[in-house]
C-alpha cells in the first residue's frame, strides 16, 4: 500500500514469516517520532490483516527488534510476523 510493503523473510523462523516494512525510513522504533505514530499503528493493523489472509487463525506473533541487544540487524524499522506453528517463549 502507500505506507508499507510486505515481503517473506529470507531466513524464516516459522512456517510463515513475513516482514512488514514502512516506506518512510525510520531507523528503529526507539528513534520514532510522535509524527510516526500513524505509521506504527498501520504496521500492526497490516500485520493482522496479513495473518488473517494467511489463515493464521490459531495465533501469530509480532516482533520488533530494537538495538543490538534486541536482535536488530537491519537499520530500518520492520515488523516480523510469524505463525503457522506453536511458538514457544522465550524465543531465544
Which role does the model predict for each range below?
Residues 1-92:
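HIT superfamily nucleotide-processing domains
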